[in-house]
Amino acid sequence: MKQEQNRIIRDTKSDLLFVQGAAGSGKTSAVLQRIAYLLYRFRNGLDEKQMMIFSPNRLFNHYIANVLPELGEKNMIQTTFQDFIAKRLGKLEVESLFEQFENETNEARKEILLLKESTFLFELIGKYIALLQKGGLRFKDIKFRGETVISKEDIQAIFYATPRYKMPARFLETKKVLREKLYELANLEAKKAWVKDEMELLSEEEYRALVPTKLEFQSFDDEQDYLAKKIVRLKFKKLHKSVLDNQFWHMKQQFGHFMQYAPRLFDLAEFNISKEDWENEIHRIVASLNENKLALEDAVLFLELCDAALGKKVNRIMRFVFIDEIQDYSKAQIAYLKSIFPSSQFTLLGDLNQAIFKRNEKSLLEEIAPLFDASRTSVVELSKSYRSTEQITNFTKEIMTESERIIPFSRQGDVPKVIQTENFVAMMDVVQREALKLKKSSNMVAIIGRNQEICEEAYLSLYKKMDVKLVHMGNQKLSEGIMILPSYLAKGLEFDSVIVLDASEKTYPSSADKTLLYTMCSRAMHDLVAVSNGEITPLFKTIPNHLYEFETLSVKTQLPSDS
């Protein structure tokens, strides 16, 4: 373990350091020590602002923020992939972690999502941009006081009249011409009646703000002319800014057109996608864009399209990028980050057994390896799990079919408990009983549910009976005591005790749920309890009986009425 951790901590040469580790194997600890080591090793030429870590959620960010000062280091730049993308999107809203997880069950879109998560469409954007050099760019009218002052047709004519430079240069030239036109239009606008009306309504204070104290006019007309132009130019400032910000280009419409045009550049059938499903996907994207929203898998494509047209704003100062829970990233997302940070060395951490968003069974390392120089790629595997007791690790590894390489740490404890109940009320009675019992010996007891809905139901059932906190997207803070949180907010974290909420057949029906269930169970350090409403999940039934304690409660509890 020491040797492997040293490889992680002290590697300064690899462009890609890929750390595959079992849950609780010390990945995060090693990487935090790596950060401290790098800051010390390059102390004369590296500061914390040249290092960035992508965490699975904001809860994990709080954890890192507390740990780094303990290592004697200042905090580096911390973000989540969603927050990073949202910042680059500006006014467009990217789907939250909650929405991303809750929408995961749509099987009809599986093949389309696999396509988007590859780099195929990402790379196709280059071909599409080349076609746009000849025509097809979507523009918007530039309006002032509700009237069009430069039409989209005029903008299109200006753009395609520019020399055949690369697309970003043509946009720069177009902006230059548009701003010149705005200056001309401002002079014409200054002669209109509304300007005279505004001048007459100016207060003394407003007048002084427009006219410098030392300025003297030769005549009343000179003064009026000056004021008129000043008023209009101030009003036109917004138009100039909108041009500088490329708001005359209809980016949302352009992205919709790209998705519509894309099947002309490849065969949908090769990706097992029907024309009908693709059309439905376009309708979904357009509907989202009309609400100023984008799904995460679309956001990367949208940004790449904008970057290809306008020029990519890269960060060449960033030296080291760390990505935790890499198993939940797509190849397209990694490719985008690599293009944004071209001078960075990447450290990727993950456990392929914990992929809760990924749909592709292909090895992640195999997928992303072509993005990096093979001669400057290092892979470190950590197979020993130190987080949980031997009993919990032996139980959780049996959930996965290919977990032979997970080696438990020889810390002893109780075997996990699996309790089957008949209904929701009975289940919540057991959850309350177990949580209060565990709290006596645990600082943090986490009741983890599959999604936000089951967590909210559990909270409503418990909050009047015991002290419990609900952790959700709007309140991502950890505290001691008993908390309820959805699976996707538990990523990367550990708790003294874990209660898996509703580990039933209806909630986790098939092998497709094994990575999610494994992730939830492997958060526990000392105690693990799983409670089901109805028949337990078949994923537990394949675990040897001696590895857990099974209990069936057949208490006849009256269910609440719907009224």
Language-model regions, residue ranges each:
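Hydrophobic anchor at the beta1->P-loop junction of P-loop NTPases
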Residues: V19-G21
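Pre-Walker A (Motif I) flank of P-loop NTPase domains
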Residues: K13-L17
